[in-house]
Amino acid sequence: PDTAPMIRKIVEKGIHIISEIEFAGRYTDSKMICITGSNGKTTTTSLIYHIFKEAGYDAGLAGNIGNSLALQVAEDPHEYYIIELSSFQLDNMYDFRANIAILLNITPDHLDRYDNCMQNYVDAKMRIIQNQTDKDAFIYWNDDPIIKRELEKYDIKAVQYPFSELKEKGSIGYI
């Protein structure tokens, strides 16, 4: 945990603690389809993985579900990785780039890890779009008031695909 004395000493020395996803991402050129949100991550990740596999794509399932991304990159590499990302994993990502970032929603969760500060948790979730370029895609729930507020703070380079419950101006898709 981030509060462990050894981890604190390492961080105090300016050394980054990186997530397993950050580590593995350094050793592959595969396309990364990353899903985060407070709710619905596992279901969405599983459905996308299923669609990729049924369509005949070489895809691996990683993150909070499936096998370790690092293990797959080393021993069973895939052209695509469908990755469920928790806020914990996003916290320790610096150079990793999601080719497709999907942000489902942001609601209060795990606030004890974030000094009971909702904005700290929100900032962690928004890290999914860091390092994206104009060649990438960002899909997000346009009905979430927190996401809408946060988007105003970012210079998003990825092509945006907002979706909503009802057909509305500005949304690409609706359910």
Question: Which residue ranges define each predicted feature?
Answer:
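Beta-strand->loop->alpha-helix junctions that form or flank phosphate-binding loops
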Residues: 18-23, 155-175
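Phosphate-binding loop of NTP-binding sites
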Residues: 1-142, 146-157
